[in-house]
């Protein structure tokens, strides 16, 4: 199979939405029957984002094969059917690590190691490997043209453009075309300078996607085409929209997919975007609204919970309600108590690390349990629910996790020392293990107990979800907790680890050790999120009737 490559770069400013634009183009090409994948090349020195602060980098998206990756890979999976893996995301740090490891082994036979050719060759090898087996591979280059950090990646794709030829490569550049209120017009000069910078390093863009708060007038498109040496039909206007799921239709309406297929000489059917039209319609026409309180510690940056936010919205689509997310700092719960939890239709406690704010999350779980308020716990959200139950229902005073209180008299949650990974191999960890790349990661089979809310949600006695954690329920306390009324509704593939818990006499108190948000998409939803939002809508209805 001959793979064609589309390289996506960004200029003028960061956060233009290269990932969304790349994913939207991929969605159109997929709708034309093509097998598409997307890669993200990140210019930072970290080996992966696994140990980076969520408040700086946003969430860490976990792939099926256990790679800790950039949040853009979540966008990719939400827009196309292709599942991402560790080949879809790599960093400058990983490239340097692998090159230096080869140098230490003597693989380079004493050669002087340089950015060109050794680093650039390593980048090219990874790009080509990531595209294998696909009709089209879209490659997003992180950062902004002009950044020092991005230069090795840009040089690598320049070389690939020469080596693969024009019939297998296309360069798409996103820029900002701002509107100046004082002048009453859009300004194209930043785009001209960005393209000039890109051309100075040997890359001539074939397509310009111009971002702005409004559509670019035809005369300004012609001006951009003239000064940037790009065909006028290849100057694409991408204005701000109220839903990212409208973007595939916007790009298709301007013929971007036809431009791509013509360039690559691909003969394929027209794109049918009916599924996306349905998503946009559902999003614009809810019949109700629910308010979900998300109790976390990284709420100053909503991108820290990007996949959770999107999964709640997807669940709203399937329940025909708009989901209003109220972000609640768990430390505020500690300081102010129940008053910050009033007026909610459900509480969700997402994953997280570190002791700060943990007691507030435990208090939120207690509030939901005692008030029959729908509760959904994810990863740490399951652990705090179990700790709360152990303390206040099972009579285990002082119960805690050894992550936060090693000397706790009742360590109901402790470090996982051994488990079966996604390949069926036994992995082991201990307290002295490195933080990076040492968690239980990736897709794992979970056995669901018949008759539970979990099994009802999945309509099955098994599910496969992705994990990212070091701590688990201490099996020594399972019998005591079960006698107190807690249901262990999900167990690991070998039934040695607790994966899900729930309460029997509660409208919806369900929690999982895994991260179901990573498998939610706007077209397919996700069973647990759908069940949770349905329970929130039912709670609101009962509350109004009372």
Swiss-Prot record:
Q: Which GO terms describe its cellular component?
A: cytosol
Q: Indicate which residues the UniProt annotation says bind CTP.
A: 14, 147-149, 187-192, 223
Q: What class of enzyme is it?
A: ligase
Q: How is its activity regulated?
A: Allosterically activated by GTP, when glutamine is the substrate; GTP has no effect on the reaction when ammonia is the substrate. The allosteric effector GTP functions by stabilizing the protein conformation that binds the tetrahedral intermediate(s) formed during glutamine hydrolysis. Inhibited by the product CTP, via allosteric rather than competitive inhibition.
PROSITE patterns according to UniProt: GATASE_TYPE_1
User: So where's the catalytic machinery, residue-wise?
Assistant: 379 (nucleophile), 515, 517
Residue numbers binding ATP: 15-20, 72, 239-241
Q: Where is this region: Amidoligase domain?
A: 1-266
User: What are the Glutamine amidotransferase type-1 domain coordinates in residue numbering?
Assistant: 291-542
Tell me what reaction this enzyme catalyses.
UTP + L-glutamine + ATP + H2O = CTP + L-glutamate + ADP + phosphate + 2 H(+); L-glutamine + H2O = L-glutamate + NH4(+); UTP + NH4(+) + ATP = CTP + ADP + phosphate + 2 H(+)
- The highest taxon in the source lineage is Bacteria
InterPro entries recorded for this chain? Class_I_gatase-like, CTP_synthase, CTP_synthase_N, GATASE, GATase1_CTP_Synthase, P-loop_NTPase
E.C. number(s) listed in UniProt: 6.3.4.2
The alphabetized UniProt keywords are: ATP-binding, Glutamine amidotransferase, Ligase, Magnesium, Metal-binding, Nucleotide-binding, Pyrimidine biosynthesis
Give residues annotated as binding L-glutamine. 352, 380-383, 403, 470
Pathway involvement? Pyrimidine metabolism; CTP biosynthesis via de novo pathway; CTP from UDP: step 2/2
Sequence positions that bind Mg(2+): 72, 140
Q: Which GO terms describe its molecular function?
A: ATP binding; CTP synthase activity; glutaminase activity; identical protein binding; metal ion binding
Q: Does the keyword Cell cycle apply?
A: no
Q: What else is known?
A: CTPSs have evolved a hybrid strategy for distinguishing between UTP and CTP. The overlapping regions of the product feedback inhibitory and substrate sites recognize a common feature in both compounds, the triphosphate moiety. To differentiate isosteric substrate and product pyrimidine rings, an additional pocket far from the expected kinase/ligase catalytic site, specifically recognizes the cytosine and ribose portions of the product inhibitor.
Under the heading NCBIfam families, the entry gives: PRK05380.1, PyrG
**Biological role:** Catalyzes the ATP-dependent amination of UTP to CTP with either L-glutamine or ammonia as the source of nitrogen. Regulates intracellular CTP levels through interactions with the four ribonucleotide triphosphates.
Family the entry assigns = Belongs to the CTP synthase family.
Q: What's this protein's name?
A: CTP synthase
- Native organism: Shewanella pealeana (strain ATCC 700345 / ANG-SQ1)
């Amino acid at each position: 199979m001959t793979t064609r490559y589309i390289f996506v770069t960004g200029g003028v400013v960061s956060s233009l939405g290269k990932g969304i634009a790349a994913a939207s183009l991929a969605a159109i090409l997929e709708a034309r029957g093509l097998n598409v994948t997307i890669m993200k090349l990140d210019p930072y020195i970290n080996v992966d984002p696994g140990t980076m602060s969520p408040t700086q980098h946003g969430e860490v998206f976990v792939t099926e094969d256990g790679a800790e990756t950039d949040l853009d890979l979540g966008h990719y999976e939400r827009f196309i059917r292709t599942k991402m893996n560790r080949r879809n995301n790599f960093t400058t740090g990983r490239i340097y690590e692998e090159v230096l490891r080869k140098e230490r082994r003597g693989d380079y036979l004493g050669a002087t190691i340089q950015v060109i050719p050794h680093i650039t060759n390593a980048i090219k090898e990874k790009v080509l490997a990531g595209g294998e087996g696909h009709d089209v591979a879209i490659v997003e280059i992180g950062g902004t043209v002009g950044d020092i950090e991005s230069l090795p990646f840009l040089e690598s794709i320049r070389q690939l453009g020469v080596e693969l030829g024009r019939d297998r490569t296309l360069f798409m550049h996103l820029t900002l075309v701002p509107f100046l209120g004082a002048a009453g017009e859009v300004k194209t000069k930043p785009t001209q300078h960005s393209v000039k910078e890109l051309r100075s390093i040997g890359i001539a863009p074939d397509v310009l996607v111009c971002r702005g708060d409004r559509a670019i007038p035809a005369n300004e498109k012609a001006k951009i085409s003239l000064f940037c040496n790009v065909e006028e039909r290849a100057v694409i206007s991408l204005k701000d929209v109220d839903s990212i799921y409208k973007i595939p239709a916007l790009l298709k309406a301007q013929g971007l997919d036809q431009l791509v297929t013509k360039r690559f000489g691909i003969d394929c059917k027209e794109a049918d975007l009916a599924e996306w039209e349905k998503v946009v319609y559902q999003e614009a026409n809810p019949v109700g609204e629910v308010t979900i309180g998300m109790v976390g510690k990284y709420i100053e940056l909503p991108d820290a919970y990007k996949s959770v936010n999107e999964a709640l919205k997807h669940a709203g689509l399937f329940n025909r309600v708009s989901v209003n997310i109220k972000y609640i700092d768990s430390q505020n719960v500690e300081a102010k108590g129940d008053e910050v939890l009033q007026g909610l239709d459900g509480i969700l406690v997402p994953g997280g690390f570190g002791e700060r704010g943990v007691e507030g999350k435990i208090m939120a779980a207690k509030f939901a349990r005692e008030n029959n308020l729908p509760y959904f716990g994810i990863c740490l959200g399951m652990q705090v629910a179990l700790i709360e139950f152990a303390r206040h229902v099972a009579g285990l005073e002082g119960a805690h996790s050894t992550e936060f209180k090693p000397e706790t008299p009742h360590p109901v949650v402790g470090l996982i020392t051994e488990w079966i990974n996604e390949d069926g191999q036994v992995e082991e960890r201990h307290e002295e293990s490195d933080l990076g790349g040492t968690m239980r990661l990736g897709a794992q089979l979970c056995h669901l107990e018949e008759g539970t809310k979990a099994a009802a949600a999945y309509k099955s006695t098994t599910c496969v979800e992705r994990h990212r954690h070091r701590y688990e329920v201490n099996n020594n306390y399972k019998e005591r907790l079960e006698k107190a009324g807690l249901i262990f509704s999900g167990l690991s593939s070998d039934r040695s680890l607790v994966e899900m818990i729930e309460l029997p006499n509660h409208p919806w108190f369900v929690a999982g050790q895994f991260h179901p948000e990573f498998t939610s998409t706007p077209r397919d939803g996700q069973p647990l999120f759908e069940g949770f939002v349905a329970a929130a809508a039912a709670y609101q209805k009962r509350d109004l009737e009372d």
